[in-house]
Amino acid sequence: HFVSAQVETALSVLFWLLAPAPADDAPAACVCAVPGNVHNIGPRILHHYLTTDGWKVLFLDGMTPLEDLVRLVGERRTRLVGLSVATDDQLPITVQSVATLRAMHRPPEAIFVGGPLIRSRPDLAGQIKADAAPGTAREARDLARQYQTAD
């Protein structure tokens, strides 16, 4: 985990130095590891992809409680939420997270799931009731483009 933390720090610093600031009216997205998932490199890469594609992206790690995730998504009027799932034991909290987000007064327009577990078992997206299960951050960015403009 030490090396992962160093990689994540390097990605964040480089991104901070090189990435353009999003426009004031940019659509909001939230990318996070589900509660209990400490693997943040994939979600961090998606955060960078979406930001450079014109989104205002809130990045949350797996230490963020579900209640805080829901509150922040609501406060920011988030259009898109991306959840990263690493292992089978995170499946129940992922299902709960999606259900809780969908029950919000203003739910996000789309909820994507990704990460190692979803990549190895894409059929889980239906069980989780996600809108999409992109296999890579690039694919997630491309799918997210349909939610960038308001209807």
List each model region and its residues.
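Glycine-rich phosphate/diphosphate-binding loops that line cofactor/substrate pockets in enzymes
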Residues: 20-23, 75-77
